[in-house]
Amino acid sequence: MNKIKGGRHKSPVKLFEVRLYNAEANVIVLYGNSMDTSARLSGIVVLSVSSPIRVKNIKLRLSGRSFVCWADESRHASPGNRIRRQVVQILDKSWSFLAPNESAKVIDQGNYEYPFYYELPPDIPDSIEGIPGCHIIYTLTASLERATQPPTNLETALQFRVIRTIPPNSLDLMHSVSVSDIWPLKVNYETSIPSKVYAIGSEIPVNITLYPLLKGLDVGKVTLVLKEYCTLFITSKAYSSTCRKEFKRALVKKTIPGLPMVDDYWQDQIMVKIPDSLGECTQDCDLNCIRVHHKLRLSISLLNPDGHVSELRNSLPLSLVISPVMFGARPTEGVFTGDHNSYVNENILPSYDKHVFDVLWDGIPSENPQLQSGFTTPNLSRRNSSDFGPNSPVNIHSNPVPISGQQPSSPASNSNANFFFGSSPQSMSSEQTDMMSPITSPLAPFSGVTRRAARTRANSASSVFNSQLQPLQTDLLSPLPSPTSSNSRLPRVRSACTLNVQELSKIPPYYEAHSAFTNVLPLDGLPRYEEATRPSSPTESVEIPSNTTTIAPSPVPTIIAPALPSTPAPPLPSHPMATRKSLSSTNLVRRGVR
């Protein structure tokens, strides 16, 4: 509130005041501790005159000071030193809006604004009000020096507050405070509050749980008291050491007759209302001249079976802050209103699973949003994901949809690319359907066949992964010639182009990833066990039939072994073969006897 001093009733100055820009209700809000953030104090000095006036200068002064005073009640204090008092100048800054000159200047009729700004230091103390014998006040005072005889100067003052509050992403808002212990042979108790920090004017939910360990034990009245502990300091050359004075006061006291019984124990939640006026309580602070902290003390009466009453006491430490949304109305200065709980819920950090991707990809320019989304979206990383829509970049059951930033492929290129663009499952041949692994379709169930196909695909992908980083081509594999023999069937191996971007971006389950480390080659048509283990003849060698199909050279670095035809074993030669017996120990003995 601006207060104008000086001047006569019929003054040509109609308006003269100080206004702040970035301060709602004249409050500067700082977040975190004294070294985290700073704030800029900016505003204007408004002057409105109805007729020309002569002035010497227009000045503005920023002042901040701390005041500490108390009466020394010790017996050793002399009568002249009973009152201890100290005033410290925290801020002192001045502005002059007119050039200094001995001659007066004439200001014509009209409205004038004089801007100013100042960077507040990060360690500026909070505004303290409401504590007896201590306060910290910040004031902006503007003065208008008129060139009249006698001089009639005008002054206007604006008092603003500096509040340091906890940031909305502070961990103290999420940490609960709990005290639990056992009274041997009597009760097991636990008291807790869901958070450590509460705003002035809000409510504190106190949870109390008691488990009886003594038969016949009952709970009497429960008393909760919110206490404020203050310590004042004076450091001066006149004193040999730092003087201090400690005192405390009860802010809120609430008593209930007892606790309700739930099953075999007592449990209840009690709401404690914090005062909403700075004249009744003070926020937590730790400054050079004052220190303030708060505790919630509990007292529970226990009625023993023999008739005597025991009392259980404990305390919960907490912090009181001024919420930024609790700047009150001007008529009731110092009264703060607002919903602190909604402020915390709206500004609290999201959970890890919702925020981790924003942090990882923050600042990376997105040249192709749809293509990059395929690599980073969790929907494409789930096994058998079915979150595909009609406008998805890759859809095996829909017409080709061009990806943003890419040219649509021609029908000729799509015919050999094995992407299945523009083809429905009904129009595919049986051979094309066999080449399509069940894991490729997002709607296919996961079965044993799918696991074998996944293992084959994992090993194939590991061998051609480097080639997949280049632009996909549609004609990487030449068409295979048809086999001449009915009993020899060539294996169909999926080419590099069939492993599209979505398949490479999927994260396989554990058994697929585990099987990818095996050294099993992705080959079919291997010889049967009897053919592979049949011993070869020492005189004749088996010749490979001339009708064996060979594989055309392919740019894909995948080696495909030809399938051996299932032919009967070669006949034995007609002429008898000389056999030689091994010289056993029996034959040696017989030769020696003969």
Swiss-Prot record:
Pro residues bias spans: 565-574
Record keywords: Phosphoprotein
GO biological process, one term: endosome transport via multivesicular body sorting pathway
Residues modified as Phosphoserine: S584
GO molecular function, one term: protein-macromolecule adaptor activity
Biased composition (Polar residues): 368-398, 534-552
Keyword Phosphoprotein carried by entry: yes
InterPro entries: Arrestin-like_C, Arrestin-like_N, Arrestin_C-like, Arrestin_domain-protein, Ig_E-set
Region Disordered, annotated ranges: 368-417, 531-594
Low complexity bias spans: 404-417
Domain of life according to the entry: Eukaryota
GO cellular component, one term: cytosol
Protein's UniProt keywords contain Transmembrane helix: no
Sequence similarity: Belongs to the arrestin family.
Name of the protein this chain belongs to: Arrestin domain-containing protein C584.15c
Source organism phylogeny: Eukaryota, Fungi, Dikarya, Ascomycota, Taphrinomycotina
